[in-house]
Curated annotation (Swiss-Prot):
Name listed for the protein in its UniProt record: Undecaprenyl-diphosphatase
Alphabetized GO MF terms: undecaprenyl-diphosphatase activity
Source species, domain of life: Bacteria
Top-tier EC class: hydrolase
Topology within the bilayer: Multi-pass membrane protein
GO CC annotations on file: plasma membrane
Keyword set, alphabetical order: Antibiotic resistance, Cell inner membrane, Cell membrane, Cell shape, Cell wall biogenesis/degradation, Hydrolase, Membrane, Peptidoglycan synthesis, Transmembrane, Transmembrane helix
Cellular localisation: Cell inner membrane
Length: 266
């Protein structure tokens, strides 16, 4: 990859990873528009690591508080709102781990194509609109509870289907279950940490076994750009949804789905 490709792909990853608009739908566009080849396993690890650093640093205070409370709940039996939230995040992670392990080969072989991504981009965009408009949206993140956390976790597992959007699916489920927009977004962001960390470790293990040459300059640049873009994305996304809701992202998803359909059928 040349420097221009690194910048564009890292920006796409950083800007779309935490927005409810599907990063996979965007990463397929350069291939469709410009004929770019797959960026490779090492670059995937780099840009995902940049996004992971962004969410960890942005929510560092919440994560540190949750971690300490979680440790206290294990070794001292002290339960608090933050320890419960930590356990709910862990519980919500399990469905994606389970179904990801079972279905990853099937998904990669049969579902990772432009047709599936176009359909899921539109369908789950409409579901996000419905959830945002019709749900009660009055619960805080500390009122999630284990049942709601598990259901949101199943939504995250559903997002293994390309084009669905992990953040889009989890926010849609959280809104349907009564969480406020801010709570739905924060729970989704916090859920991304164990999932992204686990994915980075698994892909990193595959990379360690690979004998392909590694362009370290491209990896460092991609990681930095992805980090900056993802950090800014989280910050401004929380501001946008507090003022305008999910409608701008629904409209964007529908437009993106139409563009993808145009490439497929015309």
């Amino acid at each position: 990859m040349d420097t221009f490709q690194v910048i564009i792909l890292a920006l796409i990853q950083g800007l779309t990873e935490f927005l409810p608009i599907s990063s996979s739908a965007h990463l397929i566009l350069p291939a469709q528009l410009l004929g770019w080849e797959d960026q490779g396993l090492s670059f995937d690890v780099a840009v995902n690591t940049g996004s992971l650093f962004a969410v960890v640093i942005y929510f560092r205070h919440e994560l540190w508080t949750m971690f300490n409370a979680w440790i206290a709940s294990i070794f001292r039996g002290q339960q608090s709102e933050d320890s419960k939230l930590a356990w709910w995040i862990i519980l919500a992670t399990l469905p994606a781990v389970f179904f990801g392990f079972l279905a990853k080969d099937f998904i990669a072989t049969h579902l990772r194509n432009a047709e599936v991504i176009a359909v899921t981009t539109v369908v789950f965009g409409l579901l996000l609109w419905w959830a945002d408009k019709m749900s009660r949206r009055d619960l805080t993140v500390y009122q999630t509870g284990w049942r709601k956390a598990l259901l949101i976790g199943f939504a995250q597992a559903l997002a293994l289907i390309p084009g669905t959007s992990r953040s889009g699916a989890t926010m849609t489920a959280a809104l349907m279950l009564g969480l406020s927009r801010d709570a739905a977004a924060r729970f989704s962001f916090l859920m991304s940490v164990p999932v992204s960390l686990g994915a980075a470790i698994l892909v990193g293990k595959d990379l360690a076994k690979s004998e392909l040459p590694i362009d370290y300059q491209a990896l460092i640049l991609g990681t930095l750009i992805s980090f900056v873009a993802a950090y800014a994305c989280i910050h401004y996304f929380l501001k946008i949804i507090s003022r305008m809701g999910m409608t701008p992202f629904v409209i964007y998803r529908l437009a993106l789905g139409a563009v993808l359909c145009g490439f497929i059928f015309f």
